[in-house]
Amino acid sequence: GAVPCGKDGRQCRNHADCCNCCPFGTCAPSTNRILPGCSTGMFLTR
């Protein structure tokens, strides 16, 4: 299921610890230094 995350609280279909949402709705862990909360890969929900 989608989970709210990011500053705007939009829904993300994929979840990661401390996730934020990108314009494309993908999530990334907060440890991403280059693009915080952004990733081209998807993190599947456990």
From Swiss-Prot:
Top-level taxon of origin: Eukaryota
Residues where D-leucine is found: L44
Gene3D superfamilies listed in its UniProt record: 4.10.40.80
GO molecular function, one term: sodium channel regulator activity
Keywords: D-amino acid, Disulfide bond, Ion channel impairing toxin, Neurotoxin, Secreted, Toxin, Voltage-gated sodium channel impairing toxin
Proregion positions: 46
Chief localisation class: secreted
Expression across tissues: Expressed by the venom duct.
Annotated InterPro entries: Conotoxin-I_CS, Toxin_19
Recorded domain comment: The cysteine framework is XI (C-C-CC-CC-C-C).
Protein name: Iota-conotoxin-like R11.18
